[in-house]
Amino acid sequence: ASSCKDSGRMPENFDYGKVENSVYKNNFFGFELPIPADWVVQDTEQMKKISEEGQKIISEHNEELGEKIKASEVRSAMLLSVFRYKDDSVVGQFNPSFGIAVENLGTFSSIKTPEDYLQQAKSLMLKSGIDYKFPIGFVPVKIGNKNFTVMELTAIYKGNVEVGQMYYCILDKGFAVSIVISFGTDEQREQLRHIISNIRFN
């Protein structure tokens, strides 16, 4: 039988983590992240819906790429997704969020560094047909007690809504681990950066 590293599937001891007392803990990667009590943690079904909506947007612009992203789900997982407000309570403003996603790199021998992974992600985004802009290159940054590499981007969604995102990436245990923050204003960006700065690795 081939190992999970060969297939790119999730290992048997993989831990999706859980939220207890407003703290997300993950034993597989050995970290925890406090979550502000008034923010809204998405459950598994909600995270699946968010992922499907993202795929749909990409497929509308590039059907072949949408299929590739769907096929990659077997080696990818969304560990955490948290929004500032409940979806149905937001009117006239962007609902900021942060999340943690991982991808098993078992089949990607070319990815040796976080920069390699972010470059691949950037290439896929540029093929998506969505109007992405990348104002800066990849920058090293310390989040909590770990050194990450960050990629910043903006995108125009649903006609005229400009959304900013920052992807903070490390490679750990054969996975790319990405913390992603999404924001509509500078104030939201700073609030999100403050939240994720509280992550602690064992």
What does each model-found stretch correspond to?
Residues 2-94, 106, 127-142, 146, ...:
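N-terminal targeting sequences that direct proteins away from the cytosol to non-cytosolic compartments
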Residues 166-168:
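Extracellular C-type lectin-like domains
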